[in-house]
Amino acid sequence: MRTAVLLLLALAGAPSLALAQTGYIPYFGKNQIRYDNFQWHTYQTEHFEIYYYPEIEPHLERIAGYAESAYQHVSSELKHDLSMKLPLILFSTASEFWQQNVQPGAAQEGVGAFAEPGRYRIVMPIDEPPDLLYRLIVHELTHQFQFDIIPTGLIRRNMPLWVFEGMSDYMTGYWRPLDIMTVRDAAVSDIVPKMSEMEEYGGFSNPRLIYNLGHAAFEFM
């Protein structure tokens, strides 16, 4: 059912949204400085090819377990399986994550992780509490399912941002208290925009509002 809803939303999508905006807030005017030389290794699971370096090895099986659990959850909810293993690129800390060069400019302060559509890669740090880390994986993994389900080309480009981000937040099954507060505040203040106006971050003083209103819309559906 949710797969059908997603495809219908794609067909009815509002005008253009660049895929480069779906995983993170655009980042301009800064250079990424690399301080570390990471020694990469790979670890295979049923659905992931995990890239890690020695500092991450003590946590590797735990993270792999989170990833596989997240896959089963998203796959079951969307009634869809991916035909390939997903590259999952791990960094030990946020500061090391900011040095990534998978998608130049994608990692910055305030960005917890990102999903890269071209090669279906997920890039993230692991220095979060277990429950938050699991939800982060679910969110980014949902993006990869979206990229796989929604046809490429014109239809995918027309997907509004609230669909991509709202659905990914909805799939985590969790509301942060601050996020639900922003939704209530928008409703009480009568400033909830039309869905056709929730296509990009522009015009919103709080970029999280796009995520939160989209989350609320999927919860309603």
Where are the predicted features?
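Carboxylate/His-rich catalytic cores and anion/metal-binding grooves
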Residues: 164-166, 172-178
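Short alpha-helical scaffold segments that flank and stabilize functional sites
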Residues: 13, 70-73, 171, 175, ...
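Juxtacatalytic substrate-recognition/specificity segment
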Residues: 21-160, 177-179, 185-210, 214
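Sec-dependent N-terminal signal peptides
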Residues: 3-14
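Alpha-helical scaffold elements that line and support the substrate/ligand-binding pocket
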Residues: 168, 214-221
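Sec/Tat signal peptide C-region and signal peptidase I cleavage site
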Residues: 14-20
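Residue-level detector of short, conserved catalytic/binding motifs and their immediate flanks
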Residues: 8, 86, 166
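An amphipathic alpha-helix/helix-turn recognition signal
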Residues: 15, 161-163
